[in-house]
């Protein structure tokens, strides 16, 4: 073992002074740093030292010291191999730690040789080791569980031998100190230390991890009825809105407790208010006002209103009755009017308004409606009740036989004909194209055979349409169509027009209907000896086979003409060659002996070589030429492609690429674009080169004749006529009032003189207007205007119609052209003695003054006989009138009015005035007295009262105006004493000094206590205020509220809820 471990280790006992400044004495040695702890210190030693004060040299050659609360210690070079002969010391010193927990993360050392030991305390000594580790713990999966040492210091010693090494170890650590230092708990909370944590126990009213949150007791909104919540610590206070109280403003203060409503009004408590429901007849906030039911002037027809409690009485003038004088006496109750007449009640009279057909004062007379001869045109009048009936002559109708029967009403005219009514008949004015009595016949416009050149005529309404034979056109098919106009003949052909056709005279070399075909001159095979014939325009070209020549290849070429045979050989001509018959046998065809020039194969492109003397001859394959067959024969040289076709030369042939509109090997065939029949609607197709042309039938146009020419496009129809397009034509449907092919002629509707009874006809488009003479109306002035139709005669007058006028026959009592004036029978002043004349229909009524009667008020009466004076008044006749002498308290013509003595508002200080007969009574408010409530009075002292100290007095009136009662102080009541005698008296029965006094007489007669009180109107709530004037013994209101001085006291009808308590 290491020598330094064999040394005797001396434990140093260091006395540590607890408190602040443990490091003040600088106890740490060898350059170590002092760190304050809890009542102690820790020296952070440099490597190689340990001990409480780092005063021991360890001699270790590796290791280190750690002072953080959490960390790790590794073997040297970890995770690489550690060193042999390692003596490592690790010190773990953590300030304020109470325990340190170690966890072995990795451990691989030589078994039994390389060992880690650990212990606690400031000095490392293997003899004091708590445990040790060695071996391949990680590999063997036997790493020990984490272990904890108590205290703030621990050490590890790692020693190795001199041979096998390994990767070593890694040990992590964490410490747990006093987490309540410093104490983070707020607001007086208690801190509980946990493992690496703490917990705060909050006092009531606080929450949060550190009890830093004041619980808002207002969050639950506890205050009711709009109260404002003020949060406190572990509680809250509610500030109530006016009208509520209670801890949570849950109580609605009863403002009705003081009985504020007067005159029997019912108090309804509200929030911070009350509302009085008044008895009928009263109003005001407190029902203090008697409603004046006369304010709305309910009495009608001059009646006088007398106000009462919740009602009124109407004093009616003569001639009217009813609660409100609303009823006029009904003179019509006897039903005087006859024959359905309506009775109109007047004041003391009536008037009959007769039913139609009746007249007279009582409607007894039947009016003769035939008197005015109302029936016209010979009609016979038959009188009835309120009417008549006209028996008309034949041909007339209507109430007055004024209407000529309209035979056009059916209507009889057909096909748009206009019917003109006559007397017992009619005339039809037919629309263009129709005739007949009722316009029932369609006029046949084809009857005159207007269509020419064999065309078919199709009759229409007011017109016709010609369907032309082939080759003709025009409205009447009068025009021969020029089929040459479209120039159908091609290639210079001359066109000759025919009926519905044409003939083309073709130029040389062309043929066909339109000279569209190039004539094939090769068709007769003119070329001889196997030559090829190539057709051209108006000709051909022969391409000869070898050995022939000539226009038709009719000549065999004489190849012997050049004397090819030598050495006396005889030349025999052949087709495209020759044969030499030699004088002597030779090896060549030309009888010479020569080298074989064919040996070098001079003939190209498959040509066959024939050796000749001093040369060779190549027989070329078709399509090649030249000495050596090196030239591709140009088959296009003869221009074989016709009609502009493009010739492309090939070997022994060619290809023609034709221009549009041509086809065939030599482009000699023109394509017939008409083969698909592109022309529509009978159009004739003319083939063109690469196109066609349509010669359209009359009435059609466009490239393929697909469009029907709109002959309406030029708007030929005049005056609003509607154009209907047809094939090669149109038809105008004229607007009413016009006629003609193009609607150019306006129809004269006045020609038939339709206007009757002298009316002037004014011609218009499709009609006419009759300007009638005065007195007539209607479309043709056929109707005599009934000037009576507007009922111009008023007031029951009978109207008789005349020509351009009328006559009114008035009922009795009316006059004027329209019976509009009621004859004024009062104009002669028939009523006597001041009577008022009321004009009626055909009569009058006199409204007599009192005490007169008769038709003309000529009869004098006893005015007092009807006892008009009311309420005990005396009636005095004065001429024909009377005067009522009223008793006091009444007024009016008949003393019917109870004088309202309250009208002058005599009651003062809010007193309620109650009207009486010839007088009034004031119902004073509490605190006021006197006839008019003009004096300040006393409260009604009877009953039980409590003052602010809960002293009690019970007061009772006596017949002398004095008051007697029992008085007890709060102390006396609390101790159960008997009540002393109390005498309460007014200073004057006349209320000239509104004060009162209490005299308390004790049973033992020892002494008295007395005071005087002043009534302060009771404030509407019966509240008394008393002033103490002398105190002979200390037994009143808590020693005069603890002052022994003169003072004021407040008395109410209820015991005080809060009062000063007596001293113990």
UniProtKB/Swiss-Prot annotation:
Occurrences of domain Avidin-like (ranges): 937-1056
Q: Can you give the residue ranges of the EGF-like domain?
A: 20-55, 176-212, 214-250, 252-288, 290-326, 328-364, 366-402, 404-440, 442-478, 480-516, 518-554, 556-592, 594-630, 632-668, 670-706, 708-744, 746-782, 784-820, 822-858, 860-896, 898-934
Q: Which cysteines are joined by disulfide bonds?
A: 23-34, 28-43, 45-54, 62-88, 180-191, 185-200, 202-211, 218-229, 223-238, 240-249, 256-267, 261-276, 278-287, 294-305, 299-314, 316-325, 332-343, 337-352, 354-363, 370-381, 375-390, 392-401, 408-419, 413-428, 430-439, 446-457, 451-466, 468-477, 484-495, 489-504, 506-515, 522-533, 527-542, 544-553, 560-571, 565-580, 582-591, 598-609, 603-618, 620-629, 636-647, 641-656, 658-667, 674-685, 679-694, 696-705, 712-723, 717-732, 734-743, 750-761, 755-770, 772-781, 788-799, 793-808, 810-819, 826-837, 831-846, 848-857, 864-875, 869-884, 886-895, 902-913, 907-922, 924-933, 939-1015
Give the UniProt entry's GO cellular component terms: apical lamina of hyaline layer; cytoplasmic vesicle; extracellular region
Annotated GO molecular function terms are: biotin binding; calcium ion binding
Extract the SMART domains matched here.
Answer: CUB, EGF, EGF_CA
Q: Which residues are glycosylated?
A: 30, 136, 851
**Localization of this protein:** Secreted, Extracellular space; Cytoplasmic vesicle; Secreted, Extracellular space, Extracellular matrix, Hyaline layer; Secreted, Extracellular space, Extracellular matrix, Apical lamina
Name the UniProt key words of this record, in alphabetical order.
Calcium, Cytoplasmic vesicle, Disulfide bond, EGF-like domain, Extracellular matrix, Glycoprotein, Repeat, Secreted, Signal
Stated name of the protein: Fibropellin-1
Which gene name belongs to this protein? Answer: EGF1
């Amino acid at each position: 073992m290491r020598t330094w471990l064999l040394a005797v280790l001396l434990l140093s006992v260091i006395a540590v002074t607890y408190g602040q400044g443990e490091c003040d004495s600088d106890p740490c040695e060898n350059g170590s740093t002092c760190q304050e702890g809890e009542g102690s210190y820790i020296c952070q030693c440099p490597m190689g030292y340990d001990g409480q004060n780092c005063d021991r040299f360890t001699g270790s050659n590796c290791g280190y010291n750690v002072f953080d609360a959490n960390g790790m210690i590794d073997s040297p070079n970890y995770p690489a191999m550690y060193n042999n002969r390692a003596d490592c010391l690790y010190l773990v010193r953590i300030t304020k730690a109470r325990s340190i927990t170690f966890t072995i993360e990795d451990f691989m050392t030589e078994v039994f040789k390389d060992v880690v030991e650990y212990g606690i305390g400031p000095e490392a000594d293997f003899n004091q080791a708590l445990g040790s580790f060695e071996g391949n713990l990680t590999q063997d999966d036997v790493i020990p569980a984490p272990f904890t040492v108590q205290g703030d210091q621990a050490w590890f010693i790692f020693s190795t031998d001199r041979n096998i090494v390994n990767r070593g170890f890694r040990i992590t650590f964490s410490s747990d100190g006093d987490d309540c230092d410093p104490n983070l708990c707020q607001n007086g909370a208690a801190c509980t230390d946990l493992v690496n944590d703490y917990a705060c126990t909050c006092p009531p009213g606080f929450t949060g991890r550190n009890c830093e949150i004041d619980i808002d007791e207002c969050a639950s909104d506890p205050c009711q009825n709009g109260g404002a919540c003020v949060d406190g610590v572990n509680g809250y206070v509610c500030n109530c809105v006016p009208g509520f109280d209670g801890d949570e403003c849950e109580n609605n203060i009863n403002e009705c407790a003081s009985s504020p409503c007067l005159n029997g009004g019912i108090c309804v408590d509200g929030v911070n208010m009350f509302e009085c429901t008044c008895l009928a007849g009263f109003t005001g906030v407190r029902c203090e006002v008697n409603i004046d039911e006369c304010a709305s002037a309910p009495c009608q027809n001059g009646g006088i209103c007398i106000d009462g409690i919740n009602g009124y009485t109407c004093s009616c003038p003569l001639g009217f009755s009813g609660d409100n004088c609303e009823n006029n006496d009904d003179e019509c109750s006897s039903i005087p009017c006859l024959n359905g007449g309506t009775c109109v009640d007047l004041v003391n009279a009536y008037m009959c308004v007769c039913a139609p057909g009746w007249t007279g004062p009582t409607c007894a007379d039947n009016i003769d409606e035939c008197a005015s001869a109302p029936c016209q045109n010979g009609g016979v009048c038959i009188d009835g009740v309120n009417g008549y009936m006209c028996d008309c002559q034949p041909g007339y109708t209507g109430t007055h036989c004024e209407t000529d029967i309209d035979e056009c009403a059916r209507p009889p005219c057909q096909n748009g004909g206009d019917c003109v009514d006559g007397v017992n008949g009619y005339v039809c004015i037919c629309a263009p194209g129709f005739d007949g009595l009722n316009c029932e016949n369609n006029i046949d416009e084809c009857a005159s055979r207007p269509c020419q050149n064999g065309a078919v005529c199709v009759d229409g309404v007011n017109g016709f349409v010609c369907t032309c034979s082939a080759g003709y056109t025009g409205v009447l098919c009068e025009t021969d169509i020029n089929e040459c106009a479209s120039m159908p003949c091609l290639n210079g052909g001359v066109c000759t027009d025919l009926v519905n056709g044409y003939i083309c005279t073709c130029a040389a070399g062309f043929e066909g209907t339109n000279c569209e075909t190039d004539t094939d001159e090769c068709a007769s095979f003119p070329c001889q000896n196997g030559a090829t014939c190539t057709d051209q325009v108006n000709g051909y070209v022969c391409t000869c086979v070898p050995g022939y020549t000539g226009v038709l290849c009719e000549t065999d070429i004489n190849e012997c003409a050049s004397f090819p045979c030598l050495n006396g050989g005889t030349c025999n001509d052949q087709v495209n060659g020759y044969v030499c018959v030699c004088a002597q046998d030779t090896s060549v065809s030309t009888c010479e002996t020569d080298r074989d020039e064919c040996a070098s194969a001079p003939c190209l492109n498959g040509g066959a070589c024939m050796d000749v003397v001093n040369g060779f001859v190549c027989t070329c394959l078709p399509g090649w030429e030249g000495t050596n067959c090196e030239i591709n024969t140009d088959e296009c040289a003869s221009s074989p492609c016709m009609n502009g076709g493009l010739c492309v030369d090939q070997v022994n042939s060619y290809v023609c690429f034709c221009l549009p509109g041509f086809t065939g090997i030599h482009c000699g065939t023109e394509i017939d674009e008409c083969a698909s029949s592109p022309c529509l609607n009978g159009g004739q197709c003319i083939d063109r080169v690469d196109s066609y042309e349509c010669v359209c039938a009359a009435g059609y146009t466009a490239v393929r004749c697909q469009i029907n020419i709109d002959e309406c496009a030029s708007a030929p129809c005049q005056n609003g006529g509607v154009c209907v397009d047809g094939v090669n034509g149109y038809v105008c449907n004229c607007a009413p009032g016009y006629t003609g092919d193009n609607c150019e002629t306006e129809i004269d509707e006045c020609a038939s003189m339709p206007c009757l009874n002298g009316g002037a006809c004014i011609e218009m488009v499709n009609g006419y207007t009759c300007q009638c003479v005065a007195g007539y109306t209607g479309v043709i002035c056929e109707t005599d205007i009934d000037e009576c139709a507007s009922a111009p005669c008023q007031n029951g007058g009978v109207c008789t119609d005349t020509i351009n006028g009328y006559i009114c026959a008035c009922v009795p009592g009316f006059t004027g052209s329209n019976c509009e004036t009621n004859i004024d029978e009062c104009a002669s002043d028939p009523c006597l003695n001041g009577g008022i004349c009321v004009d009626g229909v055909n009569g009058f009524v006199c409204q007599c003054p009192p005490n007169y009667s008769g038709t003309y008020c000529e009869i004098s009466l006893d005015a007092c006989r009807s006892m008009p004076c009311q309420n005990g008044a005396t009636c005095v006749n004065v001429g024909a009138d009377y005067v009522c002498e009223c008793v006091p308290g009444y007024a009016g013509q008949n003393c019917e009015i109870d004088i309202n003595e309250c009208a002058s508002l005599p009651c003062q200080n809010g007193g309620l005035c109650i009207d009486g007969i010839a007088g009034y009574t004031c119902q004073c408010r509490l605190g006021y007295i006197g006839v008019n409530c003009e004096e300040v009075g006393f409260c009604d002292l009877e009953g039980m009262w409590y003052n602010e100290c809960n002293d009690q007095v019970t007061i009772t009136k006596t017949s002398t105006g004095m008051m007697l009662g029992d008085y007890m102080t709060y102390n006396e009541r609390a101790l159960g004493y008997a009540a002393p005698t109390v005498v309460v008296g007014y200073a004057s029965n006349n209320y000239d000094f509104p004060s009162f006094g209490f005299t308390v007489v004790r049973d033992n007669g020892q002494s008295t206590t007395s005071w005087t009180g002043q009534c302060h109107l009771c404030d509407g709530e019966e509240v008394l205020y008393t002033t103490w004037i002398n105190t002979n013994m200390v037994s009143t209101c808590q020693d005069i509220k603890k002052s022994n001085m003169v003072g004021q006291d407040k008395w109410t009808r209820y015991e005080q809820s809060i009062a000063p308590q007596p001293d113990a």
